[in-house]
Amino acid sequence: MRHRKSGRQLNRNSSHRQAMFRNMASSLVRHEIIKTTVAKAKELRRVVEPLITLAKSDSVANRRLAFARTRDAEVVGKLFTELGPRYQERPGGYTRILKCGLRAGDKAPMAYIELVGRPEAAQAVEVEAAE
């Protein structure tokens, strides 16, 4: 029985899932909008929102925590220099999920996940996880 177990398995083992969400979080921070499946977008929200909350208070300890979770120095820099100050007054809810139909190959429900208040120049990037 799976009573009270949170999180989706997404047909992956735990290390694959962790690596996939680490990569997707880095892509979302870098591009500010990505296209993925609805289930992955909903799970990605649980990874990215705490990172942005962490970036709202800049300290060496918080930067090290963010680096431990993303393993990407460029992403950590953007989190603390751009995104943290941008969302300083917002108490959570930094992402938006917009459903965009079904994928052509397997009819999987697709969605854009984007950062709220992003510059309009940012273009969507498709993220395809290893399947």
From Swiss-Prot:
Gene Ontology process terms (BP): translation
Q: Does the keyword S-adenosyl-L-methionine apply?
A: no
Q: Carries keyword Ribosomal protein?
A: yes
Keyword entries, A-Z: Ribonucleoprotein, Ribosomal protein
A cellular component term from Gene Ontology for this protein is: cytosolic large ribosomal subunit
Under Gene Ontology molecular function, one entry of this record is: structural constituent of ribosome
What does the record note on quaternary structure?
A: Part of the 50S ribosomal subunit. Contacts protein L32.
NCBIfam families, per this entry?
L17
Family of the protein in this entry: Belongs to the bacterial ribosomal protein bL17 family.
Please state what the protein is called: Large ribosomal subunit protein bL17
Give the organism, scientific name: Shewanella sp. (strain ANA-3)
Provide the gene name from the record: rplQ
